[in-house]
Swiss-Prot record:
Belongs to the bacterial ribosomal protein bL35 family. Residues 1-16 have a biased composition (Basic residues). The keyword Thylakoid does not apply. It comes from the Bacteria. It comes from Streptococcus pneumoniae serotype 4 (strain ATCC BAA-334 / TIGR4). This is Large ribosomal subunit protein bL35. The gene is rpmI.
């Protein structure tokens, strides 16, 4: 039986935390900032944790991620 491979696109977008959670960065950060307030832009810089409903599916793609 072959080993399951890590989904490389997902590996570039998520990092595992020390407690086993998954850290992600926010969407809507590449352009069109003139339509966003300073507060929105500031909050978009912060990382966020993966929601519990998505955790199981994303974890399956990142089987061998350290």
């Amino acid at each position: 039986m072959p080993k399951q491979k890590t989904h490389r696109a997902s590996a570039k977008r998520f990092k595992r935390t020390g407690s086993g959670g998954l850290k992600r960065f926010r969407a809507y950060t590449s352009h069109r900032f003139h339509g966003k307030t300073k507060k929105q832009r500031r909050h978009l810089r912060k990382a966020s944790m993966v929601h519990s409903g998505d955790y199981k599916r994303i974890k399956a793609m990142l089987t061998r991620l350290k």
